[in-house]
Amino acid sequence: MQLNSNGWHVDDHIVVAVSTGIDSMCLLYQLLNDYKDSYRKLTCLHVNHGVRSASIEEARFLEAYCERHHIDLHIKKLDLSHSLDRNNSIQNEARIKRYEWFDEMMNVLEADVLLTAHHLDDQLETIMYRIFNGKSTRNKLGFDELSKRKGYQIYRPLLAVSKKEIKQFQERYHIPYFEDESNKDNKYIRNDIRNRIIPAIDENNQLKVSHLLKLKQWHDEQYDILQYSAKQFIQEFVKFDEQSKYLEVSRQAFNNLPNSLKMVVLDCLLSKYYELFNISAKTYEEWFKQFSSKKAQFSINLTDKWIIQIAYGKLIIMAKNNGDTYFRVQTIKKPGNYFFNKYRLEIHSNLPKCLFPLTVRTRQSGDTFKLNGRDGYKKVNRLFIDCKVPQWVRDQMPIVLDKQQRIIAVGDLYQQQTIKKWIIISKNGDE
């Protein structure tokens, strides 16, 4: 049984994940024999999921095996009681916790490469699983031989080797292993694919499951193209402020993208900047309908912390409380520099004293101001609409009133002509 050993070098510290099943035990056997000179150091990791009664016996067997072959072994017992109590997916929860521990141990061991025993049949099973459960459009279709993690790499040297070859190899060299009885239980989707669906397809001479590998190659090429296109779009159209986590993108530019690319763009942005994962395709499609509607302004709740705001030509992601905690009323009795929400007010000493005290507040229903250079008044709300001011900005913008409660300034949009030089309002941080 030949391993693909291109994933590590002779001076590497390699770590192999061993379950004591036939696949990982055959991999370990080869690493100790035909490939014993292909690495600098070998360490084993074993996870006891604590779900099966045989887990203790398997761990003891592996301890004795590794001691006999002078291999360092580290064992982790997982607590999956939370998933059992809630009837959650044990397999998915176990995988997440397993790889969290792998990440930790690879860092502690300062190792270079983690080897897993995924083989050709696992690859075909995974491809089929992702097609049938709808997860094929935003993920690669199966395993890559090489995957990158934080600080190390995962390599799968058996990915071109079939289960049949592994069984023949085990029988030839009498390699000890444990059979996980839960692998026969078809209540688990992957087991059902492996035990029932794939054999049924193989019985038909006109069908070949192996053709899925061609589909994977084509699919993954398209996936890479989408990822590249998404990065190009983000680089060109997305503005992001790291401190406030405020993200802005052209609504029209986003709407012009095909839906498949929209999903990839949002996947990239939400996972990178907001640690949001696994938004369903159905949810995305509902958002896209709203984004492409003629409605000028609306909001969508992402979480209890983040919100999507659509404001005229912009698609914005920001903190939900951006418009919740701000000044409502402030009194200014003398010239100076003042701050109101996200605005800076410079009140000059030349401002007539008869106008003091000034009142600074946010908008109120029915607010009007005197037009400059002509008779008549205009509603503040109409000014906001004409200037396409987003709703949450309207709720924060300072409106300045004189002693007689007449509006003499509306944010950075309007100042009464007679005092224009003496009240300067700018967004905090603007030059």
UniProtKB/Swiss-Prot annotation:
Keywords: ATP-binding, Cytoplasm, Ligase, Nucleotide-binding, tRNA processing. It is an enzyme of class 6 (ligase). One of its GO terms (cellular component) is cytoplasm. GO terms for biological process: tRNA modification. InterPro entries: Lysidine-tRNA-synth_C (IPR012796), Rossmann-like_a/b/a_fold (IPR014729), TilS/TtcA_N (IPR011063), tRNA_Ile_lys_synt (IPR012094), tRNA_Ile_lys_synt_N (IPR012795). It comes from the Bacteria. Its EC number is 6.3.4.19. SUPFAM superfamilies: Adenine nucleotide alpha hydrolases-like, PheT/TilS domain. Belongs to the tRNA(Ile)-lysidine synthase family. This is tRNA(Ile)-lysidine synthase. It comes from Staphylococcus aureus (strain N315). The gene is tilS.
